[in-house]
A protein has these predicted regions:
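A short, N-terminal "cap"/entry segment at the start of jelly-roll beta-barrel domains
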Residues: 1-50, 130-162
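Conserved short histidine dyad/triad with adjacent acidic residue
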Residues: 24-25, 35-70, 84-92, 99-103, ...
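Generic preference for hydrophobic/aromatic residues in regular secondary structure cores
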Residues: 53, 107, 114-115, 159-161
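Alpha/beta-hydrolase fold active-site loops
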Residues: 73
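Glycine-centered positions in the ABC transporter ATPase nucleotide-binding domain
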Residues: 80-81
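Ligand-binding loop in jelly-roll beta-barrel domains
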Residues: 89-90, 100-131
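C-terminal and inter-domain tail/linker signature
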Residues: 98-99, 142
């Protein structure tokens, strides 16, 4: 038989609707200090916790000069493109989970990219600060890994450029 929602369970306010992201407009200028060249599509914002999920797309040859800090947990899955950041280069399939108040960036992309982001712990806000090191293309790998994955550390074999 087909699936149906449980009757009388849950909170209708928190219902997640099916969205056609191809029909959704990108929003820009979502922070006055955010570098130009990116757009966001909000997929869901929990009305009770303000936890948010969204897509972020950026143009090719875009980079930032400052680091960011958020008061909430931030989670990301890279859907397409590549990202050069303060801890190395991420490619499609890259994932991170970052605790609140951890400075990160600056970031850049040669190809442009599409991310899926999610926050936990309330409403997202961003504070910009000077980066601990300046942005550069092809930074050294400096990934933070849980101890059980340390043996996997090292360069990914294959081509450096797309």
């Amino acid at each position: 038989p087909g699936c149906s929602p449980l009757q009388g369970k849950g909170n209708e306010q928190r219902l997640v609707l099916q969205l056609d992201t191809f029909q959704m407009p990108y929003t820009g200028n979502f922070h006055p200090e955010f570098p130009p060249g990116a757009g966001r599509r909000i997929l869901y914002q929990d009305p009770l916790t303000q936890d948010t999920s969204w897509l972020l797309g950026t143009l090719p040859m875009r980079w930032a000069e400052r680091a960011e800090v958020h008061p909430v947990v931030e989670e990301m899955y890279l859907l397409a493109g590549e990202v050069h950041g303060d801890r190395g280069v991420m490619r499609p399939g890259a994932y991170f989970w970052r605790p609140e108040f951890v400075p990160h960036g600056p970031y850049g992309t040669q190809t442009g990219n599409l991310y899926f982001f999610r926050t936990q712990g309330g409403s997202l806000s961003t504070t910009y600060q000077d980066a601990r090191r300046p942005f550069r293309w092809w930074p050294d790998d400096d990934v933070v890994l849980p101890s059980q994955y340390e043996s996997a550390r090292g360069a990914v074999p294959g081509t450096r450029r797309w």
